[in-house]
Regions:
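Outer-membrane beta-barrel domain signature
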Residues: 102-109
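Short S/T/G/P-rich N-terminal loop/turn motif that feeds into the first structured element of a domain
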Residues: 14-102, 114-134
Length: 134
């Protein structure tokens, strides 16, 4: 259920009047911090990835960091990360560029040093209502 809510919420950021019913690809990660790592490490990682994204040709994606306020399984994850893409094709292009580059590969290696992720899923999400003006 947590993943479903994360996926739905992340997809909202791609919606506009013309694409409200187009499915978006959303990748979700549920993670715990590795020993000695914490939110400051993630904040630095986000700074680095945002700088890298400025250089990407395929940078049409949104990143969302989720910190649980209440979940049924309190030990499941320290954070969730969602990466929302406009389509599966957009996801493939972005990931091919990211993982195919030295900088992207180094950023992913750093990500794995910070987090231990127990779950990774890709969902197709279709927005059915936009009430928050996002």
């Amino acid at each position: 259920l947590l993943t479903l809510l994360l996926v739905f919420s992340s997809a909202l950021t791609f919606a506009d009047d013309h694409a409200a019913n187009e499915p978006a690809a959303v990748e979700t990660w549920l993670c715990t911090f590795n020993e000695g790592k914490g939110m400051a490490d993630m904040d630095k990682w986000f700074d680095d990835i945002n700088e890298y994204a400025k250089t990407q040709t395929n940078n049409k994606y949104n990143l969302h960091l989720w910190v649980p306020n209440f979940v049924s399984d309190l030990k499941r994850a320290d954070i969730a990360l969602t990466v929302a893409f406009p389509s599966l094709a957009g996801m493939a292009a972005s990931q091919e560029e990211f993982f195919g580059s030295k900088v992207g590969s180094a950023l992913f290696e750093e990500y794995q040093e910070i987090l231990d992720c127990s779950s990774r899923e890709v969902w197709m999400v279709t927005q059915k209502r936009m009430g928050m003006g996002m």
